[in-house]
Amino acid sequence: MDERDMVKRVKVFASSELKLNILLCLKYREMDVNDLQGVLGGRNTTILHAIRDMTDDYLISRGRQGYRLTNLGKIRGCVLESLMGVLDDLEARPDFWLNHDISSIPPEMLERLSMLRRSEMVSTNPASPLEIHERLESLLSTSKKISAILPLLIFPKDSKVFTNALRRGSRVDLLMTEKIAGSLLDDGSISAYEVERLLKFESFRLRLIGEDLKLALFVTESFLYLGLYRHDGVYDVGTGAIYLGESAVAWGMELFEYYAQRSRELDEGDLTRVFRSSIQPEAEAPPLAGEDPGAFDVMIVEDDLGHATLIRRIFEESSPRWRVHHASQLQDALRWIEESYGRPFLVVADYLLPDGCGLDLAGKAERPLEVGFPLIILTGFGSEKIAAQAFKSGAMDYVVKEADSIQRLPEIAEEALLRWRELKRRAAGGEGHPSPQEGQGLPLKV
């Protein structure tokens, strides 16, 4: 039978809603015509006619207590239920599957998406783009077994998610890409020695894979978390799916094992060698349009470590030219600005900080050039009053902490730098107010 004939047969069978319902009703127990009528409604004669057709197709046979499925009927019922499960999941969250890159999910795993029927979808709150990761971290804090695939740093580098799990006796099987393994050492926040300490736990396994994976996966004894990259190549930090139940966990473990078999396990002896080779500098990327060659310093002034990590990652993933720094307090930022005098930089500062306001960095300035550097203000809530205050204090831009706006920060920074250079050009040509030296503005009011 060729494919066209098979399509015709499937179409004939699928076109009968009654036959499909009979197949599902008989999947778990024998039923007579009256039982089927009680569940499905309709006339006995109509049900009997459908049963006759299904008997001729060897899908149904007579049993002691009524009608039952043959082996062919049971197989077709399982296929039907699987198809319904896939359609149910796709219809429940079409945006999740439509707007993300699923190339790292093998075709055989996509065929078994019906295993994810029992699920809960957690989407970001626009005012809290890290809500999904906070929820994930909370669930992991009580998990006894964690198998994870990390193509990027989901949590802050100083997060204790895995360390705490090992200390309470949980098993942790961690699979990382070579790229993320190298980034663990890039700023000294974690060292090979510290990872070696984790490897001393018998319940900890560390694997490395050279493929560029486009998914993040966490599987525990009770749930599965799946995070995907958008089609533009950026990981979607604001949206993920949490699936509950044994079937979903089984699907997640199959996906984990698929990549675990393609990875290599590390021990204490080869850990340092692997990390050193993974962080060899890559070829310098060409400068962005309108930019001078070389790196550009960006200071993130943010007391929320999770938000700061997210913003750092967005900048670093957008271009290797961004050299990102972080300060959690105003005084630390002021000290860095003073030390950076004489070289160009940009500051992205939260409006509310533990020891002041992000606008305090502008001092007594009323115009951008009087600030002495491009300043972008972040806030967790939109306010026309704050926006007006920001611009009156010389800020180049004002950004509300919403998922889309945070993702666009590198683009917003580029636009701010272009406007900043244009302001300096005009000032140098006598078209505007005099320009202070780069990094030197009016006295700060802290």
Swiss-Prot record:
UniProt-listed GO biological process terms: regulation of DNA-templated transcription
Role played: Member of the two-component regulatory system FilI/FilRs, which is involved in the regulation of methanogenesis. Regulates its own expression, expression of the filI-filR2 operon, and of genes involved in methanogenesis such as acs1, acs4 and mtrABC. Acts by binding to the promoters.
Organism: Methanothrix harundinacea (strain 6Ac)
Induction per the UniProt record: Autoregulated.
Keyword terms: DNA-binding, Phosphoprotein, Transcription, Transcription regulation, Two-component regulatory system
GO molecular function: phosphorelay response regulator activity; transcription cis-regulatory region binding
Residues in Response regulatory domain copies: 297-416
Lineage, broadest ranks: Archaea, Methanobacteriati, Methanobacteriota, Stenosarchaea group, Methanomicrobia
InterPro entries xref list: CheY-like_superfamily, FilR1_middle_dom, Sig_transdc_resp-reg_receiver, WalR-like, WH_DNA-bd_sf
Listed PROSITE patterns: RESPONSE_REGULATORY
PTM per Swiss-Prot/TrEMBL: Phosphorylated by FilI.
One Gene Ontology term, aspect cellular component: cytosol
KW Oxidoreductase (keyword) present: no
Residues recorded with modification 4-aspartylphosphate: D350
Encoding gene per record: filR1
SMART domains given in the database record: REC (SM00448)
Official protein name in the record: Methanogenesis regulatory protein FilR1
Gene3D superfamilies reported in the protein's UniProt record: 3.40.50.2300
